[in-house]
UniProtKB/Swiss-Prot annotation:
CDD domains: ABC_Org_Solvent_Resistant. ATP binds at residues 38-45. NCBIfam families: PRK11831.1. Keywords: ATP-binding, Cell inner membrane, Cell membrane, Membrane, Nucleotide-binding, Translocase, Transport. Part of the ABC transporter complex MlaFEDB, which is involved in a phospholipid transport pathway that maintains lipid asymmetry in the outer membrane by retrograde trafficking of phospholipids from the outer membrane to the inner membrane. Responsible for energy coupling to the transport system. This is Intermembrane phospholipid transport system ATP-binding protein MlaF. The complex is composed of two ATP-binding proteins (MlaF), two transmembrane proteins (MlaE), two cytoplasmic solute-binding proteins (MlaB) and six periplasmic solute-binding proteins (MlaD). The keyword Ribosomal protein does not apply. GO terms for molecular function: ATP binding; ATP hydrolysis activity. It is an enzyme of class 7 (translocase). One of its GO terms (cellular component) is plasma membrane. Its EC number is 7.6.2.-.
């Protein structure tokens, strides 16, 4: 039995002439939290869109539970996406409907359940993230942390197999960040989810990740458990994890001789 829910094999993706990924390979194990980290601008969010079938690669395979996302028909892809939840960096709540209706939206969209059952499911999901009492509030009445939790409740509304988190800790105060960290870990275990967490917050994401990848230079440059990565001697990994300003990734953008340019 295959233990991987996601397998990315020999993936190449370009935007115009710019190569984002060149022969990228990674796996996401079922029931585990996998972190994807790397410098800004290397395409981590793009990778989530590729896994979700929103973008198509130039070559390679993206297997979701054995099915190649790149070869599915629109109808097949629609069915597969029901098994995926996405927590966007912005939360992406609908601003003109209540918190309750935001969580109910995917259930109403993808099922034919009666409203009384939908109500029970929505209240259960809101209870799981601590927001059952905020069901009637509009998104504008929620704090940033509450909005992120409401978006998480919506992401788990259909009991997906996979949840993808895009920078879930961005803009969160320490308390909200701690709550979201706890929720990701607790829900992953309680609901037997598989989670992919894209984040720049090294310490936080490594505290909950079962396995992690660091992506740079169009490919995976390091992978392993949190302990293995923290013990890495690769200078690129050390610079990224410690947040050092200079190293293999130079502080100064390449330029001609400074004195020569000043007095030209």
């Amino acid at each position: 039995m295959n233990q991987n829910l996601i397998e990315v094999k020999n993936l190449t993706f370009k935007r115009g002439d710019r190569v984002i990924y060149d022969n990228l390979n990674l796996q996401v194990k079922k029931g585990k939290i996998t972190a994807i980290m790397g410098p800004s601008g290397i395409g981590k969010t793009t990778l989530l869109k590729l896994i979700g079938g929103q973008l198509m690669p130039e070559q390679g395979e993206i297997l979701f539970d054995g099915q190649d996302i790149c070869r599915l028909s629109n109808r097949e892809l629609y069915e597969v996406r029901k098994r995926m939840g996405m927590l966007f960096q912005s939360g992406a709540l609908f601003t003109d409907i209540s918190t309750f209706d935001n969580v109910a939206f995917p259930i109403r969209e993808h099922t034919h359940l009666p409203e009384n059952l939908i109500r029970q499911i929505v209240l259960m999901k809101l209870e799981a993230v601590g927001l059952r009492g905020a069901a009637a509030l509009m998104p504008s009445e929620l704090s940033g942390g509450m909005a992120r939790r409401a978006a998480l409740a919506r992401a788990i509304a259909l009991d997906p197999d996979l949840i993808m988190f895009d920078e879930p800790f961005t803009g969160q105060d320490p308390i909200s960040m701690g709550v979201i960290l706890s929720l990701i870990k607790r829900l992953n275990e309680a609901l037997n989810l598989t989670s992919i967490v894209v984040s720049h917050d090294v310490e936080e994401v490594l505290s909950i990740a079962d396995y992690a990848y660091i992506i740079a230079d169009q490919k995976v440059i390091a992978e392993g458990t949190s302990e293995q990565l923290l013990q890495s001697q690769d200078l690129r990994v050390v610079q990224f994890l410690k947040g050092e300003s200079d190293g293999p990734v130079r502080f100064k953008y390449p330029a001609q001789d400074y004195v020569k340019e000043l007095f030209e």
